[in-house]
Amino acid sequence: MEHVTMAVTSSSPGPAPLSLLSNNDDFIAPFNINTKFPSAIVPPRTSSNQPISVAIPSNRISSAGLAATQQAQTRKRKASVAQISLPSMLPTSFSPYTMAPQPPQPPPNPDRFATEDFFSPSRRTWSEEKEKVLTGPYDYLNGHPGKDIRSQMVKAFDAWLDVPSESLEVITKVISMLHTASLLVDDVEDNSVLRRGFPVAHSIFGIPQTINTSNYVYFYALQELQKLKNPKAVSIFSEELLNLHRGQGMDLFWRDTLTCPTEDDYLEMVSNKTGGLFRLGIKLMQAESRSPVDCVPLVNIIGLIFQIADDYHNLWNREYTANKGMCEDLTEGKFSFPVIHSIRSNPSNMQLLNILKQKTGDEEVKRYAVAYMESTGSFEYTRKVIKVLVDRARQMTEDIDDGRGKSGGIHKILDRIMLHQEENVAQKNGKKE
């Protein structure tokens, strides 16, 4: 057994040298005999300036070999430290909110709060980068656009209302903003996983940020609306936003209390929730138009058609399954139009009600629920209701048009709804169109 004597000196206490803190292989810590030779016995240090006697098995390393190892490591460490400066250890780029190294600052002076004007326009620091942070979830969802039915509706009704182009641009933008913002909240409240075939915004940005963004966009839309300079605009906005939240509130209440509404309760809810944004756009257009045509009764019927058709497609449509997941309304526990009909067609059978209670993601259970609803005639009933409402909307469209030949846009929208429904039935029946 040979003994190697190493002189270890210590300076005053202070932060560890950079070479001790780095995990980079280029930074070699000073020779640590405990690490290199775990079996070595290091006696307690009694003085920072006294030699440390370490017993090392002679068959492991010689004193000459140890000295050579120390010298090589010291040279490598000095070379590495000389080549690598502190900034190279930091990220190569910084976002506006990454903490970059700052020079020492003088301590803050609390006396400045007695005199400084913190609210002057020159001190405001709201920037484009901050705006992007706030609108992140909204921009994300906008980056995966839907079918843009609402802007198509605006154009179709404008054939009768002839709204000035500047006003129409504002109205179209406001409706789009409100619709997208409402979807952000809907996905949170419904515990959705997919929207338009992509992960929902709150699964990426988090629930708090997504809710805040949605609320922010509501008020941003209100600010945008004031460009119309129409005293009726704000009143229309507040009335229909209240209706939207009333409808959504009842929908959530029925789901969370497992309360099956009546068909009339459902229709009232849809008129508020889905019809609200449809009416908002048309009422704003009428407020900016010189035409005396009242399109609100027609848009109310169209709102019913859209929501009932959406409920139907959620449980029946393959494309819907790809975009939002299989029978998402069943997983949510939602009392949709076919579900309400099925439950009330046989109140003594509690199976469907219990499936809703489970909020299941099991596809076999959901297939069973769909088969049960089919056995109660609920899908056939829903298809008939949609057709009756579409026929009613067509008649109302012709009454409004009164032979002027400006009803084509509305008829195209209604045609698309019926075609979509027929294609879904054909797919289910295994037919080829």
From Swiss-Prot:
Q: Which Pfam families match?
A: polyprenyl_synt (PF00348)
- The first-level EC class reads transferase
Q: Name one GO molecular function term.
A: dimethylallyltranstransferase activity
| Binding-site positions, Mg(2+) 1 | D186, D190
Record-linked InterPro entries: Isoprenoid_synthase_dom_sf (IPR008949), Polyprenyl_synt (IPR000092), Polyprenyl_synt_CS (IPR033749)
Report the pathway entry.
Answer: Isoprenoid biosynthesis; farnesyl diphosphate biosynthesis; farnesyl diphosphate from geranyl diphosphate and isopentenyl diphosphate: step 1/1; Isoprenoid biosynthesis; geranyl diphosphate biosynthesis; geranyl diphosphate from dimethylallyl diphosphate and isopentenyl diphosphate: step 1/1; Isoprenoid biosynthesis; geranylgeranyl diphosphate biosynthesis; geranylgeranyl diphosphate from farnesyl diphosphate and isopentenyl diphosphate: step 1/1
Q: Which residues make up the binding site for Mg(2+) 2?
A: D186, D190
The entry's localization annotation reads:
Cytoplasm
Q: Which UniProt keywords apply?
A: Carotenoid biosynthesis, Cytoplasm, Isoprene biosynthesis, Magnesium, Metal-binding, Transferase
Protein's job: Catalyzes the trans-addition of the three molecules of IPP onto DMAPP to form geranylgeranyl pyrophosphate.
Name of the protein in question: Geranylgeranyl pyrophosphate synthase
Name the source organism: Neurospora crassa (strain ATCC 24698 / 74-OR23-1A / CBS 708.71 / DSM 1257 / FGSC 987)
